[in-house]
């Protein structure tokens, strides 16, 4: 079973209050020590009991820590709030870090181009050579990767263009096949029109031919009658 929650209030029993004070004081001193060691912090702890007894802990010195606190407090009151002081401190630290980074970059660039190799030892030169070889290997690997990607893209693009070309050719063939019947109908209409223009229709000639020419069976019927009228009757 876990412990129940302890209500935070003044302990009325004197003995219990003294026992609790000793336990909590020792725990507080232990935490202050751990904080100073683990985090490299300057810690000063001052505790007065209810009877006026002093208990203190400091990883450096309580007096020096208090003096530092007074100075920081006075500087803060003169220069501004704590947030402003922290901001100034961080700006200074960042400026120092930027300068260090810039100097390291300049040193590396001089090393790469070979400007500062005259002052290097054999061991340093071997280290620089190994770094350069690793860098060149990474550059070549990245270069080959980009080239392969570009070749793959061009191959896909070629296939797409070929498919588009085949599609356009099929459309052209379909259009040509659809226009062939229309061309044949247009040619027939043109020949009929030319025949009508070259041989115009004349209704008078048509009537003359019909009037002057009698049907052959009708002329055959009239011929015996004409012969009978021109002959004398024979008397026996």
Swiss-Prot record:
UniProt cross-references to InterPro entries, sorted A to Z: MADS-box/MEF2_TF, MEF2-like_N, TF_Kbox, TF_MADSbox, TF_MADSbox_sf
Observed effect of gene inactivation: Homeotic transformation of stamens into lodicules, and ectopic development of lodicules where they do not form in the wild-type.
Molecular function terms from GO: DNA-binding transcription factor activity, RNA polymerase II-specific; protein dimerization activity; RNA polymerase II cis-regulatory region sequence-specific DNA binding
GO cellular component: nucleus
Occurrences of domain K-box (ranges): 87-178
CDD domains: MADS_MEF2_like
Domain MADS-box: from-to ranges: 1-61
GO biological process, one term: positive regulation of transcription by RNA polymerase II
Gene3D superfamilies: Transcription factor, MADS-box
SUPFAM superfamilies associated with the record: SRF-like
Keywords, sorted A to Z: Activator, Developmental protein, Differentiation, DNA-binding, Flowering, Nucleus, Transcription, Transcription regulation
Pfam families reported in the protein's UniProt record: K-box, SRF-TF
Role, per record: Probable transcription factor involved in the development of floral organs. Acts as C-class protein in association with MADS58. Involved in the control of lodicule number (whorl 2), stamen specification (whorl 3) and floral meristem determinacy (whorl 4), but not in the regulation of carpel morphogenesis. Plays a more predominant role in controlling lodicule development and in specifying stamen identity than MADS58.
Note in the entry: The transformation of lodicules into stamens is observed in overexpressing plants.
Protein known as: MADS-box transcription factor 3
Lineage of producing organism: Eukaryota, Viridiplantae, Streptophyta, Embryophyta, Tracheophyta
